[in-house]
Amino acid sequence: MSNSSSQLKRGLKNRHIQLIAMGGAVGTGLFLGSAQVIQSAGPSIILGYAIVGLVAFLIMRQMGEMIVEEPVVGSFSYFAQKYWGRFPGFLSGWNYWVVYILVAMTELTAVAKYVHYWWPHIPAWVSVLFFFVLVTCLNLGNVKFYGESEFWLAIIKVAAVISMIVFGLYLLLTAGNDSIASFSNLWQHGGFFPHGFSGLFYMLAFLMFAFGGIELIGMTAAEAENPEKSIPQAINQVIFRILVFYVASLAIIMSLIPWNQLDLGGLDKSPFVMIFSQLGIGWTAHLLNFIILTAALSVYNSGMYANSRMLYGLAVQGNAPKVFAKVSKQGVPTSAVIFSSILIFGCVLLNYFIPEEALSYLMYMAVAALVLNWAIISFTHLKFKRSMKLENKVAKFPALFSPLSNYIVLTFIGMILYIMWTQGFEKSVIIIPIWIAFMFGLYTILSWKKSL
């Protein structure tokens, strides 16, 4: 692809890459999705995020090793196709595209929940439609616009979470004897595991959704100005972000009020907002709701970006219609952005017909697609390592503890499938082999047509 009408531009600077990696990891899975897990697991949710976060970090290092060696467009599908075969590449690319369609739809649905906190009279589909149009227009501009918008949205998230931790810590350290705020709330009121370890174990699949956007950095490689430097830096900082954004923030807010006294009500309310509201600090609750809304928009913005770049990559590889390989003068794959947007528009319809159930359905569908995606990345990395060994090459950014880390990841994925199967989400598990079979049939038909 040598002409200007078919190439992306390296318009993302190091600071963009760092914040995109951060932004993809902090969204609805933490700010809204943690409500249901707190009710089921209590304070042990902190350990749960640490466990899933560690697995996500291992995946990031495996992916990072491949990306630094070859910073190409459509990284996941490219590596699966090169080191595993054409069908794994075809499946990986389209599956990742579906993952981010679902993630974008989930975050967009969550935005309506946050708007509802202030204006309950506004229908969910109206809020969804407004932000859908706004973010779509943003992604049709130069990639630098996306980089800058995501940079500042992520800055807001980072500053907010750190400020909340500091403010929460201040409330804990200055609490009087009659205050309910205390670190002891983490082990009192039923203990750290109030419903036993099973209460946490069966929530791990739900927690996995929170880390669904963490591998987004792989999509930035083709548009990063210095991928060999920026990609490793961003990936290595992920573990510290997990400790701060997930572990530290939840430890602080769950110390402020006993977990069993939180008025959460399922997936409709953010525990971050409700805790400060129950403490009588209304202005903080409103400020946090605004911050959390920007967090959801940030991940949705990233989802739109990832969708279009993966679709572009599939087209370049010959696994999608060539029209999606065309880019504008600004280096934006316009056709890919528009087509992805049309699918995401389904979120507006979901919120019109089933506003109450939309978020829960989308989250578990996203986890099912994410399970397959992580498995493909880890399997592909094993084949990549075998190829590197045969060619006597030394990796510039080797994965941690490979191949042991690969087997840890794959075992964890098997465990997630078991949890989903036994906790009433059999359909999410059953749809995985059906999806693979459908994609294989489509791949076979397309391959046959190409051979004619």
Model-derived features: where do they sit?
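Helix-loop-helix junctions that connect adjacent transmembrane segments
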Residues: 3-8, 46, 120-123, 155-286, ...
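Membrane-interface "cap" regions at the ends of multi-pass membrane proteins
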Residues: 1-35, 39-44, 56-61, 70-73, ...
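Extracellular loop-to-transmembrane helix junctions
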Residues: 8-9, 32-127, 131, 240-241, ...
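TM-loop-TM module centered on a large, flexible mid-protein loop between adjacent transmembrane helices
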Residues: 78-80, 85, 117, 234-301, ...
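Membrane-helix boundary/coupling elements in multi-pass transport proteins
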Residues: 72, 95-110, 211-224, 282-322, ...
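Helix-loop-helix connectors at the membrane interface of multi-pass transporters/channels
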Residues: 1-5, 78-81, 107-128, 160-163, ...
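C-terminal membrane-solvent junction of multi-pass transporters and transport-like membrane proteins
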Residues: 152, 323-334, 371-425
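Membrane-interface loop-to-helix entry segments
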Residues: 112, 126-181, 212, 235-239, ...
